[in-house]
Amino acid sequence: MGEFYTKGEPREATVATCILNTGNWVLPSDYADEVAYKPPFMHWFIAIFSLPVGHITETTARLPSALSLIGITMMFFYLLYKRTNSYRAFVASIILLTSFEMHRSGLEARVDMTLAFFMIGALISLFKWEEKELKGFPLLIPVFLGGAALVKGPIGILLPCMVFGIYLLILKRYSLWKIIYKNVFIALPALAILLVWYILAYKQGGEHFLNLVYAENFGRFLGMDSKKLGISYELGHEGPFWYYIPAIILGFMPWSLLLIFAAFSISIKKSTQKLSIWQRFINLDKLTLFSIISVVIIITFYAIPSSKRSVYIMPAYPGAAYLLTLLYEWALNKKTILIKLLARIILVISGILVLLIACFHFVDLYSVSTLLLHDTKTLHDISLFSTAFQHPSIFGFLVWFLLLCVFISVWYVLRKETARIVLISTLVLFICTQIFLEGLAYPVFKNGYSSRPFAEKIMSKYDLKNNTYVMNNLKEYSNLYGLNFYMDNNYKNFEKEQPKNGYFITGLSYIDKIKALYNNKYIFKELERTSDRFNDYGDVIVLYRFNQTGKEIKR
């Protein structure tokens, strides 16, 4: 799957590194003195999976997300298989599994997929509980809710209960008080689980921990200013209210292309039905109704705060996948041309990949590109693939050959078979395309932007253990999360400790500012630097040795 090439993955993996190195399972740190403000449930899994090898690896760090995606797919398939038919269950599950957002997140060391697993597990269990008329104590629901809360906080409890409560209200089979009572009934055990961690974490982190909890759970939702919250980082990426509409369409690529095709091919006719839209809505079968409600409520809830990321709405993806599958069934019966159009698009994409790899193998595209292109990043990327594909491994060749064989098979099926078989063949082709990308293409790209080579180089030449310092103020400087992970979470906060001597690492773009700030107190001598800025940090990384001059800082 490749090395870490972004800031997010090594940041999460480093929390687990701290757990193994220090034995602190309650409130570990992830960068110098930076406290991991999220509950560390996912990081516990990473640490446990890493115990046999004794340290955190890229694979063990990504394992919770991969297992969560598999678990979500299995729960979703079983839910549909028992209530619809095997064909619909299979198509919906593959659409969910291979959709761009779910597939991507399932292979990353981030908390979002683990959170989605517990929230989706809770939603499915809540749906099944209503089918039993809310009888008995559903043990799995508090477990799923508690797991979601231990991954990201109270939102893991609040949102599934909100979806379920609105679903029960629309069913009109239960009184308002019973709906409230039943939601409280299942939420309290989960809250108790979360409260235990909060108490233990407060004993370690004190008031600073409470400030972080308030900022993350209330400040982020209300769009409060980070300065007023007393935190040294910004609360996420801002986006407009409608952000999640294109986000979920892009997140379901390529399968959401059918939705776009259908939007231009359906003719709007005046309805002859006497029932209103609302009456038709509440008369839908339970599975369709619950799917619509979960998608609408989850997207609307996350649309309210200014901080937005496409992965936040992944708990809505099973419901959306089911609704999208119904659209595919409509196309199979009414608009088979749309299915074949989608198949041709995916066939072309796969064919381009097959041809491109062959070109890279037989032609030095990097040499050709240098004559036509001048963008250094583009040339760097072409160089990575050109070098790798000119000398592919046996595994790489087998993955390429698999894609070629399936490509030829689908090309034949598209000419001869029915739309149903074409759809299944297209699903298989896209799975093989993803296997090709994950097994051959992505690792080349990821490794080309990893900080690991530089970390290994400087650690072999210098004694950096417990003697390496960085700036840790996200409002002023970017953090070197990738390098920190590959150096075994060994950094200390330079500004707070102000040591007499040691090693200092920063980006080339920051060093003049830092030297000016500490001009009269420290002397910095450059030792090593990366050859370019093509790494997860996005800048030339420089290692310095510093010594204190004994003078005061000029501010």
Task: Locate predicted features.
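Membrane-embedded architecture of ER/inner-membrane glycosylation machinery
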Residues: 139, 268-555
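Membrane-integral, polyisoprenol-dependent glycosyltransferases
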Residues: 1-341, 360-365, 393, 532-540
